Amino acid sequence: MNTLRIGLVSISDRASSGVYQDKGIPALEEWLTSALTTPFELETRLIPDEQAIIEQTLCELVDEMSCHLVLTTGGTGPARRDVTPDATLAVADREMPGFGEQMRQISLHFVPTAILSRQVGVIRKQALILNLPGQPKSIKETLEGVKDAEGNVVVHGIFASVPYCIQLLEGPYVETAPEVVAAFRPKSARRDVSE
């Protein structure tokens, strides 16, 4: 069977130069381990806020490492060195605007400055590439969505649509732990993976 391959890219000048320890990749690894019931392999990269390096890294993960999903963290704000969305769009075959729109909607429930985010979602070849926030708490909120005090979903997180998108791109059938995030697919796209 086709193993799910995920690229994780933390984009930070200071973390990549050793000024402080990266928190983005560990947060993503922990979240994916709790959310995915499908086996997966990770390719991780810690790089500076340099557009050419970001573009090169995204292309390497998709074109050479055959990742089905690439998650970036950091570099999505309005500051001059925040070029992650620009690099992502530069290597995209198609834009998926709903992902960026939904990430901002989710984050606005927690902080008004979420409107300053320029996160995007794109497709390059067989892969979905998503720009996530830089803070671990915000990463989790964006992926899982907004829940009420009882744990019921009020606003769906973006990851609910990721497994079906990967399936549409002819990648592996991805399943999630519904208590973390329930993957959504139309009934016609569901399959019994125990077969």
From Swiss-Prot:
Protein family membership:
Belongs to the MoaB/Mog family.
UniProt protein name? Molybdopterin adenylyltransferase
**What reactions does this protein catalyze?**
molybdopterin + ATP + H(+) = adenylyl-molybdopterin + diphosphate
What the entry lists under PANTHER family is as follows:
MOLYBDENUM COFACTOR BIOSYNTHESIS, MOLYBDOPTERIN MOLYBDOTRANSFERASE
- What NCBIfam families does its record include? molyb_syn, PRK09417.1
One GO biological process from the UniProt record? Mo-molybdopterin cofactor biosynthetic process
Tell me yes or no: is Transferase among this UniProt entry's keywords.
yes
Q: CDD domains from the xrefs? A: MogA_MoaB
Under the heading PROSITE patterns, the entry gives: MOCF_BIOSYNTHESIS_1
Q: Please give the InterPro entries that the UniProt record associates with this protein.
A: MoaB/Mog-like_dom_sf, MoaB/Mog_dom, MoCF_biosynth_CS, MPT_Adenylyltrnsfr/MoaC-Rel
* Gene from which this protein is expressed: mog
Q: In which pathway does it act?
A: Cofactor biosynthesis; molybdopterin biosynthesis
- Its Enzyme Commission number(s) read 2.7.7.75
What function does this protein fulfil?
Answer: Catalyzes the adenylation of molybdopterin as part of the biosynthesis of the molybdenum-cofactor.
